Amino acid sequence: VTTTPAGYGTAMTTMPATESMGFGPLRISFDGRVLRPRPWTEAQSTWAAEILTTAPPGPVLELCAGAGQIGLLAVLGSSRPLVCVDMDPAACDWARHNAADAGLADRVEVREGPMDEVLRDSERFAVVVADPPWVRRDEVTRYPEDPVLAIDGGDDGMEVAWMCVDVARHHLLRRGTLLLQLGTVAQVDALRDRLADDDLVVTEVRRCERGVLVRLDLT
């Protein structure tokens, strides 16, 4: 039985139409309040799943989770728990919904709020997956179909990405991995420069259809 997030079907509430799409073997539901899943971001899930085969034991953390599709697909073939974090209540509702639809509700926890506040200081993760907004603030009007919160990366497009890096640095297990999505090679270069003497090291970069995936390992 498929359910929808709270608030649907009430006489006093008008909600955007529900949509669904395939994401790998998963069926992901969402509406216009959250960023539409991009099929090409399956590459991030696939790479994360590969990393999990040799990562240290431990759960997976997804930051800026949206409807949850990247993290859900990443852990689908494993038995690892997943924690999804997002600021947007609607995104969190859909992430819970999609976890249940995927049969993963028993090992997926969704937390709503700032990423640096909803994690316990002692929590550690084997892999962190992050798809932060990376569009420069002065360019968000080029994408009127997308919720601003989901794409606004600040003045340089890196504001939320830096937050993801800081959270990952604190919460990764030793030898753990952050798999980060960015928008441009220039953003990757900025990341390399800032982390030149850091314990979190850029070890591989892959270009995708629209964006760049960066693997960072905690040494």
Model-identified regions with their sequence ranges:
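Class I SAM-dependent transferase core
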Residues: T13-T54
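Conserved Class I SAM-dependent methyltransferase catalytic core
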Residues: M158-R215
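Actinobacteria-biased recognition of intrinsically disordered, low-complexity terminal regions
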Residues: V1-M12, T219
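General small-molecule cofactor/ligand-binding pocket signal
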Residues: S29, E109-R111, T203-R206
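Conserved SAM/SAH cofactor-binding pocket of Class I
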Residues: W40-Y143
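Conserved SAM-binding loop
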Residues: C84, G153, L180
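Mobile active-site "lid"/loop adjacent to the S-adenosyl-L-methionine
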Residues: P132-V160
